[in-house]
Amino acid sequence: MKVIGLADSELESSLRKAGIGMSASEARSIASILGRDPTLAELFCYDAMWSEHCSYKSSRAVLREFLPTEGPNVVLGPVEDAGIVSIDDEWCVVISHESHNHPSQILPNEGAATGIGGIVRDVNCMGARVVATADPLRFGDPYGRESSRVRWVAEGVVDGIWQYGNALGVPVIAGDVVFSRCFDYNCLVNVVAIGVVRRDEIIRSRAPPGSGEKGYDVILIGKPTDSSGLGGVIFASDTLREEEEEANRGAVQIPDPFLKNVLFKANEDLFRLVREKGVEIGFKDLGGGGLTCASSEMGAAGGYGMEIDLDRLHVAGEFPPEVLCIAETQERFLIIAPRELRERILKIYNEDWDLPNVYEGARASVIGRVTTHDRYIVRHRGEEVVNVPIKHLTGGIRYERVWRPRIRNLVEPDVRMPEDLNRVMLDMLASPNIASREHIYRYYDTEVQGNTVIRPGEADAGLLAPIRERDFGIALSVDSNPFYGRISPYWGGATAVAEAMRNVAAIGATPSTLTDCLNFGNPEKPEAFWEFRESVRGLADAARNLWLKGHPNQPVPIVSGNVSFYNESPEGAVDPSPVIACVGIMRDISRAITMSLKEAGDGLYLLGPRFDELGGSEYYRLIWGVTGANVPVVRFPLERSMIYTVIDAVDREILRAAHDISNGGMAITAAEMCMLSDHGISIDISDLGDMRSDKLLFSESSGFVVEVADGAEQEFVSIARSYDLNPVRLGSVSTGDIEMARDGKMLVRLDPEEAREAWSSGLREAMR
């Protein structure tokens, strides 16, 4: 394709007509390295590999500057498809975190389903058994001007998740959902998957040592390549425009969970084979960027070149080479293995698991070899259509983006004290951002595989016991508050980390690792890039200062993640949304607790003082229609002490329930603890300071409300004081109403059934 000698305007026009999204300057740099005009297939390969989605060209420098990725428990950091941390000397947890935002806005069902499909492949290709997923979701205002579209997107996304996940046989154990007008035209569908693997059975997504010298086979398994998902990574690296919606539908992949299930079982046989033979293979899923991305990254990661013959691909029709290179056909993996295993591997997939009869055209095919040269070469019909330096293709391109603070001119509102706090409580409990998520997770199979200990909705985090003969469990939580990010991207990032860790601690697990999915607007706009940079700085500071328990000054490592830019439409960008997942390890699952109250007469305690921090709160937004300015901040020593106190108290079996304070503040937190129990509460906030009562009740400053077992209150106070905390006794669990008083005056008295009806119906009504 002509590049050299064309004016910028001519070149840009030529690239767009060909369906290529790169800039003229990027095309020129490719031609300069090659010393010639690139072929059309080469430009398509570079377009995918140099997309924001694949190359991290805007974000990589910021991530490297701030994020802590190492730790004593880290087995594999964020260098491959998933991160790995140790559970004990034998077992490891594998975790990956991705986004599928643009596809889910265009085709909600297919977009969400393929998001799940891609993330579980990332975990499986490390040699792991996939044991759970989580789904942090962000939708538009269900009562706003785009309500019909918002509800259509939300319903489709939820359907896609449960239809794919249930058929695949992987439980959803965690998730959250936020509704806001900023997501009207750009929903966020983030997905997390975790798996378990023995430390000595980990498989890497790279060409193994010696594979180039020995000419290892490159084997493609799964669905026949078609044109589905073509240009998906380019589509994900641009702003959404309504007038282009129909044209973009082809960039959304087509899922098949039944085939995926069969592939996972066949993969287990592959893993068993390589263990028996004592050989190392490379194994990688085909996701964004398709065959080109998977094969070139595996070769480059091993320090080798790669030769691919497209005529050997199993395909679903006649397609030009550029389509075969970058199509994102789902349910595919790539294997790099010794030639002496070729027939055994082909037999596993084509005969033992009979892929051709499971899905028409599916199979395993040898499509190339690893080489010792430094080139990435692709042939089609006997001719070279791609011949480029493999490190140049995979190394991407880097931009030093300009950043400039966004000025919002936010102020604290002067609102009056509500006359009827009962009404305020009921309205907040019914808010779609607080109400029960049962309307969503009732569709999910949360107990498939039989390992789930704590299900969605029962606690702040999910918990599973993936190894039957062992006592340990894996906890998972996902969190982010875009309303905080709107006020302060820095504190939005920091609070997301803190809340994710609090949620894991609330069941008694110790935070072990973090992942991030960073959802922002157009990085070419200085204000948007500043929001990204500030959020990363905030979450990194939280990870560095909250520490791995038992390892002072050691950050909680961030071992996996994703950056999703261009979550923007002509109507505007999403609020800064750094979604954090936290994995915790529970040494003895029999000690885990939930958030529902257990025994009348038990003491209720508050950990964490209340501050005048209602900026971005549900109270301000829902009741008064304002954002505010005083966003919650993370006081790192205080936060660390609260988390450690709860973990230790659960371990000593003196807490019966715990719930972290977040959306809605202390009052909503305490009321939610009644929702899944037959109990009420009687609390008094007289000793919490001199702030106005509504601010004390609804401030979203971090903390916990905990139920302390009768007779164990002194021991709990002693634990808290050992961490320099002064817990406040709020009151006790009762058999009556939800009561909150101050200085002898009853502020709130709710019938638990009335409160439960508001809480259980809010999300159902919003998505009706």
UniProtKB/Swiss-Prot annotation:
Mg(2+) 2 binds at residues 122, 285. Signal peptide: none annotated. It is an enzyme of class 6 (ligase). Its EC number is 6.3.5.3. The active site is at residues 53, 100. Mg(2+) 1 binds at residues 98, 562. GO terms for cellular component: cytoplasm. Keywords: ATP-binding, Cytoplasm, Ligase, Magnesium, Metal-binding, Nucleotide-binding, Purine biosynthesis. The keyword ATP-binding applies. GO terms for molecular function: ATP binding; magnesium ion binding; phosphoribosylformylglycinamidine synthase activity. Part of the phosphoribosylformylglycinamidine synthase complex involved in the purines biosynthetic pathway. Catalyzes the ATP-dependent conversion of formylglycinamide ribonucleotide (FGAR) and glutamine to yield formylglycinamidine ribonucleotide (FGAM) and glutamate. The FGAM synthase complex is composed of three subunits. PurQ produces an ammonia molecule by converting glutamine to glutamate. PurL transfers the ammonia molecule to FGAR to form FGAM in an ATP-dependent manner. Monomer. Part of the FGAM synthase complex composed of 1 PurL, 1 PurQ and 2 PurS subunits. This is Phosphoribosylformylglycinamidine synthase subunit PurL. It comes from Methanothrix thermoacetophila (strain DSM 6194 / JCM 14653 / NBRC 101360 / PT) (Methanosaeta thermophila).
